[in-house]
Amino acid sequence: MGLLDAKVSNRNVLVTSVDNVMNWARLSSLWPMGFGLACCAIEMMATNASNYDLERFGIFPRSSPRQSDLMIVAGTVTMKMAERVVTLYEQMPEPRYVLSMGSCSNCGGPYWDHGYHVLKGVDRVIPVDVYVPGCPPRPEALIGGLMKIQELIRMEGLGISREEALKKLAEKSVDAQQVLDQTRKAAIA
C-alpha cells in the first residue's frame, strides 16, 4: 500500500484522468442519426425496436444531425444523394463518427459494375470509422458495429488521434480467416 492509498482509503475519492471520464461519457451516450436509404434501413429500424433495445447500451436515436455524434449510412448512396450525405456530415458536431452499414454503402453492392448512378462506397465522400458487411446485415451485426464504435471512443484521448485508435482497434480485432483455420486444425487433430 502506497502513500496515496493510505490517504484516500477511507474517503470517497475517484482517481482517474479527464480522458477516461470524457470517453466514458461519450461512449455511454451515443446519439446516432440514421440515414436509411434502402434495404439496410429496415434492419436498422429492427435494431432500434424492442427486441434488441439499443437504449441499454446508451444509444438514443436522433433525427437531427446537430444533435447526433454518429451517422449510420444504411443503403445505396446515389451520386445525387452524396451531396446531401456530406451536408449532413458537416452539420454534425465534433467528435463525429460514421458507420457504413451494408454492401451498398460499403462498396456499391450489386450495383458495383453496372450502376453508373451509385457511389462506389460512402467513404469516397466522408470518412468512415466502422464498416458493417452484409446485404442487408442482421441487427446483431449492426450492434457489433456500434460496439466497435464504442471501443474506438474508449481508445481515443487527448494524446491519441483517431487514426492511432483505429490502428489499435484493427490490431485488436480478430481475423475471421485465422479463426476458421484454427478451428479446422483443431478438428483435424
From Swiss-Prot:
Keyword tags: 4Fe-4S, Cell inner membrane, Cell membrane, Iron, Iron-sulfur, Membrane, Metal-binding, NAD, Quinone, Translocase, Transport
Instruction: Give GO BP annotations, semicolon-separated.
Output: aerobic respiration; electron transport coupled proton transport
Q: Which residues bind [4Fe-4S] cluster?
A: 39-40, 104, 135
Q: What class of enzyme is it?
A: translocase
- Domain of life per record: Bacteria
Report the locations given in the UniProt record: Cell inner membrane
Gene3D superfamilies xref list:
3.40.50.12280
Please report the record's description of how this protein sits within the membrane: Peripheral membrane protein
Q: Which is an annotated GO molecular function term of this record?
A: iron ion binding
The role this protein plays is: NDH-1 shuttles electrons from NADH, via FMN and iron-sulfur (Fe-S) centers, to quinones in the respiratory chain. The immediate electron acceptor for the enzyme in this species is believed to be a menaquinone. Couples the redox reaction to proton translocation (for every two electrons transferred, four hydrogen ions are translocated across the cytoplasmic membrane), and thus conserves the redox energy in a proton gradient.
Q: What is this protein called?
A: NADH-quinone oxidoreductase subunit B
